[in-house]
């Protein structure tokens, strides 16, 4: 199948004629019965594309078909591999419109391809798989099947970092419609710093757990901004290449990180924002790095003090001036205050106000 996109119906029609002639020259048959368009709304590979409403949508018949299949699976203890594959195919198709829902397919994929049971025709539904299926059932029931295109040309940019003792992030950039939704103390240029709670401190002190901390920071930032991210495109800037891959592929084999990734995806589905991650070398990610290290900022988070510490880190690392960040990273204002979290909630990383 071929999809032609152009600025006008005449241009698209001309492109279609050229393609038809080319296919004919190679002896290929054009199936005119499947021809559709030119139009501003058409169905391609089972997905309806509407350039006027700027939406991608799944036809109602596909949504209606998956609901009874999910209900049937959830009513059983053992399910045939054939039924699991059928549901997996339907949900994989839906995830083309909802890429943030892909992490909730992992359990179903594992159940279908579990090697130790390949010879068995039925699978037992685990508690985790049931939770995934229930998530899909709940979401499909309340979803109209469409997803709006996001404003990707002017993204929200969040830079973050984490260490074995803490984490931090700064809102570097945001489009006007996002800024209008944010209070004055959360505008671009404002930042957050935090440290790990008591029951996380020992675990996060191990360097092999740094990936979880690096992922926690952007997830916490997205949760904090919440509704302000609606219909936007969020770019997470991190200095951990592994986390960049996890965020962009919506996939991880680490159970702890999978929980965070699912939280991020749920936020994306709730507020309809797209998200991607890019890698910034640690030598250039100085401000988030300072915020993530209590040993450096020593809880003195006044703007002049943090600016001084950032400058010292730049000098210490001997970064060429052409690639060094500006010495005054808070040109848009001071830090914003973050409500302190109760120390009794030891399972939650602790955050403190920034002065």
For each feature predicted by the language model, list its residue ranges:
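Acidic carboxylate-rich catalytic motifs and surrounding loops in phosphoryl-/glycosyl-chemistry enzymes
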Residues: 28-43, 47, 273-286, 290, ...
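RNase H catalytic domain
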Residues: 1-4, 10, 223-287
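C-terminal reverse transcriptase regions that engage the nucleic-acid substrate
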Residues: 38-149
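Mobile genetic element proteins and their domesticated derivatives, centered on retroelements
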Residues: 23, 46, 66, 70, ...
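Two-metal-ion RNase H-like nuclease active-site motif
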Residues: 153-165
């Amino acid at each position: 199948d071929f999809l032609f996109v152009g600025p006008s119906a005449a241009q698209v029609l001309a492109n279609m004629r050229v393609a038809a002639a080319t296919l004919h020259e190679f002896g290929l048959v054009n199936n005119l019965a499947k021809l559709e368009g030119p139009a501003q709304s058409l169905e391609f590979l089972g997905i309806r594309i509407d350039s006027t409403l700027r939406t991608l949508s799944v036809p109602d018949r596909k949504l209606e078909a998956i609901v009874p299949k999910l209900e049937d699976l959830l009513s059983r203890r053992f399910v045939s591999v054939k039924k699991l594959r059928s549901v997996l195919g339907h949900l994989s198709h839906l995830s083309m419109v909802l890429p943030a829902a892909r992490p909730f397919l992992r359990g179903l994929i594992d159940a279908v391809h579990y090697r130790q049971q390949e010879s068995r025709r039925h699978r037992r539904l685990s508690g985790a798989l049931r939770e995934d299926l229930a998530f899909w059932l709940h979401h499909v029931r309340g979803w109209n099947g469409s997803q709006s295109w996001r404003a990707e040309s002017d993204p929200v940019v969040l830079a973050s970092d984490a260490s074995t003792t803490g984490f931090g992030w700064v809102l570097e950039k945001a489009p006007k419609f996002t800024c209008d939704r944010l209070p004055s103390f959360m505008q671009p240029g404002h930042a957050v710093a935090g440290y790990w709670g008591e029951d996380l401190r020992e675990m996060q002190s191990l360097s092999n757990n740094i990936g979880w901390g690096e992922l926690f920071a952007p997830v916490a930032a997205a949760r904090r901004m919440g509704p302000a991210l609606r219909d936007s495109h969020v770019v997470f800037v991190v200095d951990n290449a592994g986390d960049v891959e996890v965020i962009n592929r919506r996939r991880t084999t680490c159970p702890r990180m999978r929980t965070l990734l699912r939280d991020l995806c749920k936020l994306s589905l709730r507020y309809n924002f797209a998200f991607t991650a890019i890698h910034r070398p640690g030598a250039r990610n100085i401000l988030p790095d300072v915020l993530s290290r209590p040993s450096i900022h020593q809880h003195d988070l006044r703007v002049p003090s943090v600016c001084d510490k950032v400058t010292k880190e730049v000098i210490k690392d001997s970064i060429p001036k052409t690639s060094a960040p500006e010495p005054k990273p808070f040109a848009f204002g001071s830090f914003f205050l973050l409500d302190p979290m109760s120390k009794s909630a030891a399972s939650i990383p602790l955050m403190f106000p920034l002065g």
